[in-house]
Amino acid sequence: MWLQAICIYTVFIIIGCGIPTAAEEHSLWRWTCENNRCTKIRNEPENKEPVLSLEACKMFCDDYGLLWPKPTIETNLGNFLSKINMNTIDIQITKQGKSDDLLTAAADRFKTLVSSSVPKGFSAKAAGKSVTVYLVNENPYIREFSLDMDESYELYISSTSSDKVNATIRGNSFFGVRNGLETLSQLIVYDDIRNNLLIVRDVTIKDRPVYPYRGILLDTARNFYSIDSIKRTIDAMAAVKLNTFHWHITDSQSFPLVLQKRPNLSKLGAYSPTKVYTKQDIREVVEYGLERGVRVLPEFDAPAHVGEGWQDTGLTVCFKAEPWTKFCVEPPCGQLNPTKEELYDYLEDIYVEMAEAFESTDMFHMGGDEVSERCWNSSEEIQNFMIQNRWNLDKSSFLKLWNYFQKNAQDRAYKAFGKRLPLILWTSTLTDYTHVEKFLDKDEYIIQVWTTGADPQIQGLLQKGYRLIMSNYDALYFDCGFGAWVGSGNNWCSPYIGGQKVYGNSPAVMALSYRDQILGGEVALWSEQSDPATLDGRLWPRAAAFAERMWAEPSTAWQDAEHRMLHVRERLVRMGIQAESLEPEWCYQNQGLCYG
């Protein structure tokens, strides 16, 4: 009879034993795993099979359950789901060191993530097994970012008694242990039939990322973003194990960075006195990112992309030049004048204060794209300087002028940061592989590729020995596919880039035999047409698709990940991220039936 004590199980899943609850008896729907898909079926009164909620079913109906990004070394998810009491989760740090405060913050965040798995307006039953999480950080004194930091971890979950579940996370740094906590949070799901939290038992996961650099660029100059919106972005990044927030903080349209030594830059260049970033603001974001395993990488773009804020310095040329289409790619135009010796004192002051604000940065982005020869050539002062140096006013001579600027700026950056930290530049005519070695040392510079993934420059630079970060606009520019903001029609990089293309954008395919020189990739949100109100939907969940590509470099296509992608979108929304909807919820509940 149905009311007998039974064990709820299938071939692969055992939830527990006991009398079926009223919720189980009266649930109209249940899910069952068939051919690696969770199928929605009616829960008839005579049914004696397990009454599985959708998330419980999805946790076992795939080799990777609901994990995102999927682990890279070993993933064994056991056949048990145990009810747990969220109020009895205990986290213990087993080794002491200077990263303990970071682990404590990560542990608090883990509990918040577990709480967010319960839908708003509901409260999971305070019943079930207690959970003890042991955090084993083998190098508790490491708390600094680097390109060779160890982000690997091992995660084990077992049940030691009828009322207790143990989880152990081991890592060779705080960053690895933090990643393990993120994975553990994904192994806890809400059972909306029984109103319980469930954890997967008998788990072994060994995991590490394929690429060390996995980033998001946010442009906060075209439109201003609040500190809260930046923190929200970092929260979402941490949830999918992205590790670099690239802050494009100034541009020709605005200068929101407050500097004590050069206060007029923000006074003249910010959109308003309330739309600025102080040193305290930046340090707050840097610390917030560190606790979540996300470095905050500063960019100061030069010698182009300057304008507002620089009006009284006498250090720019062609600012607001008209028609703008002759001198730059978008209004207002503006470039620094490399011939002004006082410019480099100015830059050093900027770099010094950026070094103080972004105090934990292990790299510095110097911008360096879209420099206009015509802009420089419009200045009689620059022309005279070039003639005095016996340079012609041709393309090759303007490259010499650009190199003159870059060498001086590089020296000032090294001085300001107090070390010869890696420098990053965008692809440009200066980085063209046919002459890049004349200007940029491959051991000092990393090149960030923003042209297409088929650009011959990629192979050319790799063959010269340069390390690359991939941001090819045909797959990773998230501002593409909207209406033009200058003129009519669509914007320059249309069409819209869907998550499917993002997921399939493989640096390994682009690198061929030079894969070791690919540091990773970065999606970019240039903000001509976005602001805090549209931020979440522009980035998410597409950036999650990118995150799995960067973490795992999967050999499979997006179709194999689609059901997990739909779930990670749901997780982000529960966290308070207004992620864009990908499909009708019907598709989430009816896996495999929404195909084209």
From Swiss-Prot:
GO CC annotations, alphabetized: plasma membrane
Biological-process GO terms, alphabetical: chitin catabolic process; glycosaminoglycan metabolic process; polysaccharide catabolic process
E.C. code: 3.2.1.52
Pfam family, one: Glyco_hydro_20
Entry GO MF terms: beta-N-acetylglucosaminidase activity; beta-N-acetylhexosaminidase activity
UniProt keywords, alphabetically: Carbohydrate metabolism, Chitin degradation, Glycoprotein, Glycosidase, Hydrolase, Polysaccharide degradation, Signal
Position of the signal peptide: 1-23
Reported function: Active during metamorphosis to degrade chitin.
Name of the molecule in the record: Chitooligosaccharidolytic beta-N-acetylglucosaminidase
Natural source organism: Bombyx mori (Silk moth)
